[in-house]
């Protein structure tokens, strides 16, 4: 079908543009300067998570204008709108982080409502910060209109004392400062240069992890995840994304044609191979849920276990997203994995071609140091590992990228904290001991509510030189920037009476990341007595968005989702 001869009678926008009964609706479009020809064309939502909260999303509005050019060039009518985003770098370390994960689902919901309310026919979604990427992808799969995802790009690295630095170096410097190893002046000098441009955090933290996922899963154009936010080449990708969505619309290629079980498995492979964020284990099940596909944390973890870790990126490694882009980009990583038999090459992508077709001309660059060949991986198994055992019957997850093999097992006495603030205060004052397992609980999806990330605490531990001398477990989450023996997503969470709620100070906890186990060394009879005496805790959120989230949210194992998902739906928006 030619883009200029769309049959409006089969598109959602017919409900707001076609027939005499829609004259009032058309009058609004004329008020905004649209011509009759533009009103008769397909309407394409161009959704951005732009805001001025942080550098992560500040470049999205610029790139959205290029997307609109591409849509117009392909005979579509772009309709730009913004949704919210909560930026983790600003929300970190205080009550604001409770809003972070909840924002993912609000983003998906708000994009859905905007598309439904205005009957847009297709969608290009631009996102730059941790939860905005999966939130935007979730909305695409939920709506199932032809869609293209566009990452806003990463920040450029800062430079301090001759080394590249990121915002995580600043978080870790707080720990050095509290340990008396950094003066106020040095900390201030670092904070002033760590983040020199627009863009999301530069290491293989959550934003760049999910950007890699967007390419591996096929929702983004090849190469679009790589270029840093300030680069003008991003605008070329943006314009191409606008053209691409019109091609998808013309050929009726929808997100659920692309986001299949195989595509999700490809996404899990890229997370593991790049030493990506543990949040990938939360967001992939949530994206799958929108398509009605069962793909939980432990299934994701099985793929992590079988995938070699081949990309030397911070926080476990040495390089940042800009370096990966210059080395050959996500496409080169995918090509290495495809040639090694780790990817399903027959998966459809937004180019209209298969993943293998997209990668057929990509060559490995031997003159770079970021991506390793499969013959010499950084580790034979992925940089992220799933755990299961008596402490976490529903599973848990740990990032092992950059950890030495002899540090993959830890056993020690528990030290329990019922909030992140309690633990951070103890860490900041050095009121803990080497060899302890620090337990932060009641921070799960329901119990927080909001499943906060613990970067402030883990970075402080690392900055104090204790990152490999203690372990930390939580029913909350960890930032993609976390390093050290930090286990998150422990389920069932404390708020529903999971084993983590029954731990007492001094109980021995044993974690074996090599074999994928996490156990509480306490007799079952003792645990039964504790369980009988356990009472649910009330949160301080008795109304508002976080109260609503706590009522709806499910388990971390299944992605902490807030609605029944694709399996339960009786109609899909794209078919109205």
Swiss-Prot record:
GO biological process: isoleucine biosynthetic process; L-valine biosynthetic process
Entry keyword Acyltransferase: no
EC number(s) reported in the record: 4.2.1.9
Residues bound to [2Fe-2S] cluster: 56, 129, 201
Pathway: Amino-acid biosynthesis; L-isoleucine biosynthesis; L-isoleucine from 2-oxobutanoate: step 3/4; Amino-acid biosynthesis; L-valine biosynthesis; L-valine from pyruvate: step 3/4
A Pfam family it matches: ILVD_EDD_N
Details of cofactor binding: Binds 1 [2Fe-2S] cluster per subunit. This cluster acts as a Lewis acid cofactor.
InterPro entries reported in the protein's UniProt record: DHAD_IlvD/Edd, Dihydro-acid_dehy_C, DihydroxyA_deHydtase, DiOHA_6PGluconate_deHydtase_CS, ILV_EDD_C, ILV_EDD_N, IlvD/EDD_N
Known cofactor(s): [2Fe-2S] cluster; Mg(2+)
Catalytic site: 479
Entries under PROSITE patterns matching the protein: ILVD_EDD_2
Gene3D superfamilies, alphabetized: IlvD/EDD C-terminal domain-like
Signal peptide range: none
Catalytic activity: (2R)-2,3-dihydroxy-3-methylbutanoate = 3-methyl-2-oxobutanoate + H2O; (2R,3R)-2,3-dihydroxy-3-methylpentanoate = (S)-3-methyl-2-oxopentanoate + H2O
GO MF annotations, alphabetized: 2 iron, 2 sulfur cluster binding; dihydroxy-acid dehydratase activity; magnesium ion binding
Residues annotated for Mg(2+) binding in this entry: 88, 130-131, 453
Alphabetical list of SUPFAM superfamilies matching this protein: IlvD/EDD N-terminal domain-like, LeuD/IlvD-like
Residue numbers carrying N6-carboxylysine: 131
Subunit structure: Homodimer.
Purpose of the protein: Functions in the biosynthesis of branched-chain amino acids. Catalyzes the dehydration of (2R,3R)-2,3-dihydroxy-3-methylpentanoate (2,3-dihydroxy-3-methylvalerate) into 2-oxo-3-methylpentanoate (2-oxo-3-methylvalerate) and of (2R)-2,3-dihydroxy-3-methylbutanoate (2,3-dihydroxyisovalerate) into 2-oxo-3-methylbutanoate (2-oxoisovalerate), the penultimate precursor to L-isoleucine and L-valine, respectively.
Family to which the UniProt record says this protein belongs: Belongs to the IlvD/Edd family.
Protein name, per record: Dihydroxy-acid dehydratase
Primary gene name: ilvD
């Amino acid at each position: 079908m030619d883009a200029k001869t769309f049959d409006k009678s089969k598109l959602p926008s017919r409900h707001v543009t076609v027939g005499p009964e829609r004259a009032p609706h058309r009058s609004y479009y004329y008020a905004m300067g649209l011509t009759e020809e533009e009103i008769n064309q397909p309407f394409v939502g161009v959704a951005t998570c732009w805001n001025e909260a942080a550098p992560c999303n500040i470049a999205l509005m610029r790139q959205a204008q290029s997307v609109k050019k591409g849509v117009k060039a392909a005979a579509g009518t772009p309709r730009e709108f913004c949704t919210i985003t909560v930026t983790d770098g600003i929300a970190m370390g205080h009550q604001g982080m409770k809003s972070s994960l909840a924002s993912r689902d609000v983003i998906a919901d708000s994009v859905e409502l905007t598309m439904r309310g205005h009957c847009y026919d297709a969608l290009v979604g631009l996102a730059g910060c941790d939860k905005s990427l999966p939130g935007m992808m979730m909305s695409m799969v939920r709506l199932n209109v032809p869609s293209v995802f566009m990452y806003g790009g990463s920040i450029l690295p800062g430079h301090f004392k001759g080394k590249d630095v990121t915002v995580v170096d600043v978080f870790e410097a707080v720990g050095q400062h509290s340990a008396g190893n950094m003066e106020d002046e040095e900390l201030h000098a670092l904070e002033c240069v760590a983040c020199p441009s627009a863009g999301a955090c530069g290491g293989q933290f959550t934003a760049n992890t999910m950007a890699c996922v967007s390419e591996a899963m096929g929702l983004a154009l090849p190469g679009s995840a790589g270029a840093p936010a300030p680069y003008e080449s991003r605008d070329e990708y943006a314009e191409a994304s606008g053209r691409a969505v019109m091609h998808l619309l013309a050929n009726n290629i929808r997100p659920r044609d692309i986001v299949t079980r195989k595509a999700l498995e490809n996404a899990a492979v890229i997370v593991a191979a790049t030493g990506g964020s543990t949040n990938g284990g939360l967001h992939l099940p949530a994206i799958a849920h929108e398509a009605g596909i069962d793909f939980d944390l432990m299934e994701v973890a099985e793929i992590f276990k079988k995938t070699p870790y081949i990309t030397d990126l911070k926080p476990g490694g040495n390089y940042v997203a800009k370096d990966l882009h210059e080395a050959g980009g996500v496409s080169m990583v995918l090509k290495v994995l495809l040639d090694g038999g780790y990817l399903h090459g027959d998966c459809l992508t937004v180019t209209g071609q298969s993943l293998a077709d997209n990668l057929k001309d990509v060559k490995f660059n031997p003159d770079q140091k970021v991506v390793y060949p499969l013959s010499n991986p950084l580790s034979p198994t992925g940089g992220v590992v799933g755990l299961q055992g008596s402490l976490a019957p529903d599973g848990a997850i740990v990032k092992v990228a950059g950890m030495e093999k002899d540090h993959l097992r830890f056993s020690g006495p528990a030290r329990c904290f019922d909030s992140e603030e309690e633990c951070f205060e103890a860490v900041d004052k050095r009121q803990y001991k080497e060899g302890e397992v620090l337990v932060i609980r009641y921070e799960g999806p329901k119990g927080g509510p909001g499943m906060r990330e613990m970067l402030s605490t883990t970075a402080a531990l690392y900055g104090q030189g204790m990152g490999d001398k203690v372990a930390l477990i939580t029913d909350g989450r960890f930032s993609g920037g976390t390093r050290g023996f930090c286990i998150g997503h422990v389920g069932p969470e404390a708020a529903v009476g999971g084993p983590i709620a029954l731990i007492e100070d001094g109980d021995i906890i044993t974690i074996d990341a090599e074999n994928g186990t996490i156990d509480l060394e306490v007799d079952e009879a003792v645990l039964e007595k504790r369980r009988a005496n356990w009472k649910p805790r009330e949160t301080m959120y008795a109304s508002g968005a976080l109260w609503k989230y706590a009522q709806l949210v499910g388990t971390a194992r299944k992605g902490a989702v807030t609605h029944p998902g694709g399996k339960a739906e009786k109609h899909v928006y794209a078919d109205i």
